């Protein structure tokens, strides 16, 4: 009869105790801020990456690279300053995550693997790549996994490729390979190119960015399925930063940012075959030193990156001052007679006059473009107009807009330019027929040559060679002018 009231009393007492504890807890310390809140409070986004053409490197105009550009945009979205540090190897990269005052994000072209899942947490994917077995031109080409047996194979320590080969050993116990934490992808490709090792395994995007430096390397076959690149964060206390990263990457995919970055860094990397790469490497050693000072002076005088001028000159004439085409354009920068007169060039075969005139003409074109065209597209449009003329370029922009594409984005206009050679299209334009595929080819090649010149003239590479056999890309002679030339 009295049991129910007793239970009620005990319940009331228990609730009172719980309430008291909650009140006491409320009088204690503030809840710990989330990882994202801590990052924002510090005012900077600390990112660790790798030093390579496909990720991040410094040239005379500052930091560049696919991963750097993407991380910079993320920092800007958060209203933070970007602080970059580079890791000596992949093990140290992952080890640095989560340290006090260390990086909070790894943006380094990383593939998620079972082993790495114990070291970090990964974002949604942003780039697809394929792991590829690389061999040396002239050697027997492997075509299947069994062909790897008995070969000297070297890969990066701590890489997804090392894990992939370990997994392959379960099927092929005789397989042997080595790992090193003292090399980068560039070193692996150089070692294959020079015959120091038989094979390596790298991702397709890394090969695409670097193959031109090593004309002897070839893809043997794809090993396994396509992988996806992701950013990584430390296995922290909450998901706030990771969720913000995922949202940023998904927005970047939806609004075209990722596609534009892919086009900028990878949309032109496959334009040089073996012959083109080999020839360019030779001409860098044998021809560029004669004209480098002229390119630097013209770049400085016209506020153009001298390496862009040099890339244009190579595409136009292979750095030959006496070059002449069947259409009458002449000289190192291949100027028409009318253009030469308009920029004060009296002798198109004089290399200094030609380079100076080409620089002035390019600046004129660049300045005349509509304000709606922003960098870096503005430079690509100026290159196209340099090649095909501003009128034809404007025709292509109008056709692009009519197709519902963006007339201010090179990645859209380059798709339409070849139509200027087709009657059904050029008959609708003001300036008529043009070989519209040529400016697309011109821009793509100039961009590739410019990329190479930018990479090999890094301060840490100047005066050195990428390889020892005399056919690869030399550093630029330190005895020539050393002023920093700002880009357009």
UniProtKB/Swiss-Prot annotation:
SMART domains: PBPb. The N-terminal domain does not have lytic activity and probably modulates enzymatic activity. The C-terminal domain is the catalytic active domain. One of its GO terms (cellular component) is cell outer membrane. Its main location: membrane. The gene is mltF. GO terms for molecular function: peptidoglycan lytic transglycosylase activity. NCBIfam families: PRK10859.1. Its EC number is 4.2.2.n1. Keywords: Cell outer membrane, Cell wall biogenesis/degradation, Lyase, Membrane, Signal. This is Membrane-bound lytic murein transglycosylase F. One of its GO terms (biological process) is cell wall organization. Residues 26-269 are annotated as: Non-LT domain. Coiled coil: none annotated. It comes from Ectopseudomonas mendocina (strain ymp) (Pseudomonas mendocina). Residues 270-488 are annotated as: LT domain. In the N-terminal section; belongs to the bacterial solute-binding protein 3 family. It is a peripheral membrane protein. The active site is at 316. It catalyses: Exolytic cleavage of the (1->4)-beta-glycosidic linkage between N-acetylmuramic acid (MurNAc) and N-acetylglucosamine (GlcNAc) residues in peptidoglycan, from either the reducing or the non-reducing ends of the peptidoglycan chains, with concomitant formation of a 1,6-anhydrobond in the MurNAc residue. Residues 1-25 form the signal peptide.
